[in-house]
């Protein structure tokens, strides 16, 4: 932030008597302002030339713990650390807003930056309390009455210009402080938002990590189950192979036995056929013998009947 440097009225010490005699000198103005008999809205007339209206709010200085009247010149003089803090905050803000890929590096950097911002805001608030701008600014301006003394009018006008310039600088300082507060609050909001986004991303990353770990465990379990199944299938295949070999051996043995049985069956068939043929011949012979015997018996019976009849 740019600071307007107040113009200071330099009074030479070569003419002390002229300053003491001149009621419009800056020293006389400061001396009369710091007198304890000053009251609110008190009007003093110096030689009928200048009308000065004083209306200053008395307050307590937190550094000296006593009542005092604030010198307006102190209002336009910012603390020595304030320009550095202003430059640091403006530089940080420009660095943050200028980089589109700004990301939160870590919770430690964010906490350090937030602590630095809070310290800067506390120092500015302390400087504001020490300055007491809201309580020590004059409520009424100096009004000048035109006189015939050219020197007094010129010096009074210089005092008015210096006072108005200092007051403008004080107002600019107030505006700059207000702008710095707004920038600080905006930066805090951005930091809080980034912290919130970081926490959300951390929770999401943790959730995805847990899901990936669970999926890995499930895949390992499925792989182990599949491996066990493959091993059992291999064992079953080996058993089936052994059984198939054994069955082939049994089949070969059965084939040999079947061939033997077929040979025996052929033998039995031929023997049965032979026996059947021999049986048929015996039956035919027996039938022929029986027929011959029956013929002999018939002939003997006829001969016996004839002999019986002849007797």
From Swiss-Prot:
Q: Where in the cell is it found?
A: Cytoplasm; Early endosome; Endosome; Recycling endosome
Name residues in a coiled coil.
Answer: 167-278
Cross-referenced InterPro entries? ENTR1
Q: Name one GO cellular component term.
A: early endosome
GO BP annotations listed: cell division; cell projection organization; positive regulation of cilium assembly; positive regulation of protein localization to cilium; regulation of cytokinesis
User: What are the disulfide bonds?
Assistant: none
Q: Which superkingdom?
A: Eukaryota
| UniProt keyword terms in alphabetical order | Cell cycle, Cell division, Cell projection, Cilium biogenesis/degradation, Coiled coil, Cytoplasm, Cytoskeleton, Endosome
Function noted in UniProt: Endosome-associated protein that plays a role in membrane receptor sorting, cytokinesis and ciliogenesis.
Family the entry assigns: Belongs to the ENTR1 family.
Q: What's the protein here called?
A: Endosome-associated-trafficking regulator 1
Organism, scientific name = Danio rerio
Organism phylogeny: Eukaryota, Metazoa, Chordata, Craniata, Vertebrata
